[in-house]
């Protein structure tokens, strides 16, 4: 039924005005409780049915998140990850909530880092994820292995997921660009399917952080560096200046294009959390981002028609109206 309704709604855009009356009746007969708002290129409403009735928007929420991000951060915005080195060659890594630290990006990151600090062995790695509170939780995220339930983090790689292949007890990477690490092997052996699959890191934020550290170390070694000490967590010492700042190679506009194309919940809420962190200062929080979002929606007269609980649509507490969404798309 819904596919028929979509086709009919699209066809309305090509109808002459005198034919619209009959089309409205067909829409009402096909889906009397459906929400329909068809508009022409000038914003004139052609067919209206339940346009002010709130609905659960699901992944349509990502459109609002993308609009908010462009308004607050700007299309040229780039996420940053900062690196610090103390006198004992302990490397501190401070995550900045980059949603797109995929393996290809880590290869670029490691190359720039090794060029900046040299190839002398590092005596340890300390991961600082304090930009995100350790107890941050997104409404609707559940404790499953599904990629759409991946936890958000100040420092996570490959969308806080592991993509691997399991044959019996043997685990290998499913991607030539991604080295396999000890944590990836143990996690996928315990929770991954036989054959090829992807699991999210949801049980414990420390697990995803450890995986990020292991994968960064693997790429440092690929770039010609080496790490002799262990991976731990902690804060960057006060007064220590960054020796290297990695700026994401993708602009926000490019990341948002990937977000909307793949409907990635993890990216959506990383971006949503940055909206509040950027405008109100870190650490990030859902409350800060909701405050900024609600203020911006209110300024546009959309406070009553767009209600957000998070930025991806995974929460069923989000509520939109068709007219509110249409008005936002016209801005």
Model regions and ranges:
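Beta-lactamase-like hydrolase cores
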Residues: 15-57, 73-79, 112-121
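A short glycine/serine-rich beta->alpha loop
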Residues: 49-55, 202, 312-315
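C-terminal soluble interaction/assembly domains
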Residues: 292, 307-331
């Amino acid at each position: 039924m819904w596919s028929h309704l979509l086709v009919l709604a699209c066809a309305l855009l090509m109808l002459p005005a005198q034919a619209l009356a009959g089309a409205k009746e067909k829409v009402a007969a096909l889906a009397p409780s459906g929400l329909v708002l068809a508009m022409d290129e000038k914003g004139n409403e052609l067919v209206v049915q339940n346009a002010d009735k709130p609905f659960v928007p699901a992944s349509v929420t990502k459109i609002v998140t993308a609009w908010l991000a462009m308004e607050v951060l700007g299309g040229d915005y780039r996420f940053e990850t900062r690196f610090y080195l103390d006198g004992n060659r302990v490397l501190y890594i401070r995550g900045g909530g980059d949603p797109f630290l995929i393996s290809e990006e880590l290869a670029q990151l490691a190359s720039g880092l090794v060029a900046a600090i040299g190839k002398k062995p590092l005596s340890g790695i300390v991961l600082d994820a304090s930009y995100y509170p350790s107890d941050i939780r997104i409404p609707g995220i559940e404790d499953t292995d599904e990629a759409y339930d991946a936890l958000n983090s100040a420092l996570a790689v490959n969308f806080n997921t592991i993509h691997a292949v399991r044959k019996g007890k043997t685990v290998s990477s499913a991607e030539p660009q991604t080295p396999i690490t000890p944590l990836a092997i143990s996690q996928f052996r315990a929770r991954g399917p036989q054959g090829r699959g992807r699991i999210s890191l949801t049980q414990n934020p420390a697990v995803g952080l450890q995986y990020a550290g292991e994968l960064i170390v693997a790429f440092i070694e690929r770039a010609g560096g080496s790490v002799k000490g262990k991976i731990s967590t902690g804060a960057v010492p006060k007064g220590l200046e960054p020796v290297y700042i990695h700026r994401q190679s993708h602009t926000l506009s490019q990341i948002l294009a990937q977000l909307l194309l793949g409907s990635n919940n993890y990216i959506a809420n990383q971006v949503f959390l940055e909206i509040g962190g950027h405008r109100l200062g870190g650490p990030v929080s859902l409350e800060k981002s909701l405050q900024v979002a609600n203020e911006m929606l209110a300024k546009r007269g959309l406070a009553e028609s767009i209600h957000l609980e998070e930025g991806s649509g995974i929460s069923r507490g989000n509520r939109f109206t068709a007219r509110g969404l249409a008005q936002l798309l016209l801005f």
